[in-house]
Amino acid sequence: EGSGGSGSSGNFTTGSNVRMSSVTNTSNAGTGTSGGGNSAAASGASVNAPPVTVTLTESLLNK
Protein backbone atom coordinates (compact mmCIF):
# COMPACT_ATOMS: atom_id res chain seq x y z
CA GLU A 1 0.00 0.00 0.00
CA GLY A 2 2.75 2.44 0.95
CA SER A 3 4.67 1.90 -2.28
CA GLY A 4 1.56 2.36 -4.40
CA GLY A 5 0.52 5.51 -2.56
CA SER A 6 3.96 7.06 -2.79
CA GLY A 7 4.13 6.28 -6.50
CA SER A 8 0.79 7.90 -7.28
CA SER A 9 1.51 10.93 -5.13
CA GLY A 10 4.95 11.28 -6.71
CA ASN A 11 3.36 11.74 -10.12
CA PHE A 12 1.10 14.55 -8.92
CA THR A 13 3.80 16.23 -6.85
CA THR A 14 6.21 16.37 -9.79
CA GLY A 15 5.59 20.11 -10.01
CA SER A 16 6.42 20.83 -6.36
CA ASN A 17 9.57 19.23 -4.98
CA VAL A 18 8.87 20.44 -1.43
CA ARG A 19 5.49 18.75 -1.32
CA MET A 20 7.02 15.59 -2.74
CA SER A 21 9.49 15.26 0.13
CA SER A 22 6.74 15.93 2.67
CA VAL A 23 4.52 13.21 1.25
CA THR A 24 7.42 10.75 1.20
CA ASN A 25 8.17 11.38 4.87
CA THR A 26 4.51 10.88 5.76
CA SER A 27 4.39 7.61 3.83
CA ASN A 28 7.44 6.30 5.67
CA ALA A 29 5.76 7.10 8.98
CA GLY A 30 2.85 4.92 7.91
CA THR A 31 0.68 7.99 7.17
CA GLY A 32 -0.48 7.62 10.78
CA THR A 33 0.20 11.30 11.44
CA SER A 34 -2.09 12.30 8.56
CA GLY A 35 -4.97 10.38 10.12
CA GLY A 36 -4.35 11.96 13.51
CA GLY A 37 -6.97 10.35 15.73
CA ASN A 38 -7.35 7.62 13.11
CA SER A 39 -3.77 6.48 13.73
CA ALA A 40 -5.25 3.38 15.39
CA ALA A 41 -6.47 2.21 11.97
CA ALA A 42 -3.19 2.60 10.10
CA SER A 43 -4.37 0.54 7.13
CA GLY A 44 -7.62 2.50 6.77
CA ALA A 45 -5.92 5.87 7.25
CA SER A 46 -3.27 5.10 4.64
CA VAL A 47 -5.93 4.24 2.04
CA ASN A 48 -7.87 7.44 2.76
CA ALA A 49 -4.75 9.60 2.89
CA PRO A 50 -3.70 9.54 -0.82
CA PRO A 51 -6.96 11.10 -2.18
CA VAL A 52 -6.75 13.99 0.30
CA THR A 53 -3.10 14.60 -0.54
CA VAL A 54 -3.86 14.62 -4.27
CA THR A 55 -6.66 17.15 -3.75
CA LEU A 56 -4.36 19.47 -1.81
CA THR A 57 -1.63 19.28 -4.44
CA GLU A 58 -4.10 19.96 -7.25
CA SER A 59 -5.46 23.06 -5.50
CA LEU A 60 -1.91 24.35 -4.97
CA LEU A 61 -0.99 23.75 -8.60
CA ASN A 62 -4.13 25.57 -9.77
CA LYS A 63 -3.19 28.62 -7.71
Swiss-Prot record:
GO terms for cellular component: nucleus; perinuclear region of cytoplasm. Residues 54-63 have a biased composition (Polar residues). Its main location: nucleus. Coiled coil: none annotated. Phosphorylated with a circadian rhythmicity, probably by the double-time protein (dbt). Phosphorylation could be implicated in the stability of per monomer and in the formation of heterodimer per-tim. Keywords: Biological rhythms, Cytoplasm, Nucleus, Phosphoprotein, Repeat. One of its GO terms (biological process) is rhythmic process. It comes from the Eukaryota. It is found in: Nucleus; Cytoplasm, Perinuclear region. The gene is per. Essential for biological clock functions. Determines the period length of circadian and ultradian rhythms; an increase in PER dosage leads to shortened circadian rhythms and a decrease leads to lengthened circadian rhythms. Essential for the circadian rhythmicity of locomotor activity, eclosion behavior, and for the rhythmic component of the male courtship song that originates in the thoracic nervous system. The biological cycle depends on the rhythmic formation and nuclear localization of the TIM-PER complex. Light induces the degradation of TIM, which promotes elimination of PER. Residues 9-31, 39-49 have a biased composition (Low complexity). Residues 1-63 are annotated as: Disordered. This is Period circadian protein.
